[in-house]
UniProtKB/Swiss-Prot annotation:
Organism (species): Bacillus subtilis (strain 168)
Residues spanning the membrane: 4-24, 35-55
Pfam families from the UniProt entry: YpmT
Keyword entries, A-Z: Cell membrane, Membrane, Transmembrane, Transmembrane helix
Membrane topology: Multi-pass membrane protein
Protein's name in the database: Uncharacterized protein YpmT
Subcellular compartments: Cell membrane
Superkingdom assignment: Bacteria
Length: 64
């Protein structure tokens, strides 16, 4: 189960990097609506990553 949380965290981090990269390109093109949308997706996936790290640690302390 620990490995599932690690893979899910890595996947969500990859998605957040992708949306951050898209936000940067929309900022350079001055398309502010798409930039803010991509920043919010980036923040969403970063929060999912932090949550899954917390779940992994919480599961570890529950077993001991």
């Amino acid at each position: 189960m620990k490995r599932i949380y690690q893979y899910f965290s890595l996947l969500s981090f990859t998605f957040s990097l992708y949306f951050g990269w898209l936000a940067y390109h929309h900022l350079a093109a001055e398309d502010m609506d798409q930039m803010y949308l991509n920043v919010s997706y980036c923040a969403l996936f970063l929060s999912v990553m932090v949550f899954t790290f917390g779940m992994r640690d919480r599961k570890k302390t529950d077993k001991s």
